[in-house]
Design a protein with these regions (language model features):
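Short N-terminal amphipathic alpha-helices
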Residues: 48-62, 84-87, 102-105
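Active-site-surrounding "flap" and adjacent substrate/cofactor-binding loops of secreted or lumenal enzymes
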Residues: 77-98
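N-terminal low-complexity, intrinsically disordered segments
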Residues: 31-34, 86-87, 126-128
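Short, small-residue-biased leader/transition segments that mark boundaries at the very start
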Residues: 1-5
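Short, charge-patterned binding micro-sites
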Residues: 58-80
Length: 186
């Protein structure tokens, strides 16, 4: 379920420097990192269904073990309304990806073979103080920003045109998406 696919390319930097190997990877939906992201995303969606202004900072950790798989949910949530059943949301997200058999490391549908630990509390007052503002000026709390860069490496390929993305990353992501489609469609 969780394969890693890499694309490598030799680059010759300007200025006469020696060549360097540029590598990029993309993982499929069953990879532990993607599984954790999918579970956390499902929890965010469940909270936003209850309260469209909910603030959710939940981390997920998974571990397949011989005797029993493990999903750990930890974080803070602030919402007005009924608290979602975090365990059920996590189990369903893992099952949707395909973790439904103990033979592959985790059967998220069966509590006998998969333990879910929930350590989610109300958002701390210190973080809430930084984000509880009215109108347009709202703080970011403890959340960070990710960044990348745009380039023209994909512009000479019609099917990738307009992405302005590093070619190695675009190809590895495309391969991962196709493998996921093939797995899901059988």
């Amino acid at each position: 379920l969780g394969d890693v696919y890499k694309r490598q390319k030799w680059l010759s930097p300007p200025g006469g420097m020696s060549s360097v190997l540029f590598s990029s990877e993309s993982v499929t939906s069953g990879h532990p990192d993607k599984l954790c992201d999918a579970i956390s995303d499902a929890i965010v969606d469940a909270c936003l269904t209850v309260d469209c202004n909910a603030r959710v900072a939940v981390e997920t950790c998974v571990k397949g073990k011989e005797d029993k798989g493990l999903i750990v949910l930890a974080g803070e949530v602030s919402l007005d309304g009924a608290i979602p059943d975090y365990e059920a949301v996590a189990r369903q997200a893992a099952a949707n990806i395909g973790y439904t058999s103990h033979a592959i490391g985790m059967d998220a549908t069966n509590p006998e073979y998969c333990e879910v630990q929930v350590h989610i509390t109300t958002q701390s007052a210190n973080i809430a103080q930084g984000v509880n503002r009215d109108g347009l000026d709202q703080g970011a709390g403890d959340q960070g920003m990710m960044f990348g860069y745009a380039c023209e490496e994909t512009e000479s390929y019609n099917e990738l045109k307009g992405r302005y993305f590093p070619l190695a990353a675009a190809l590895s992501q495309r391969l991962s998406r196709r493998l996921t489609t093939v797995r899901e469609e059988g």
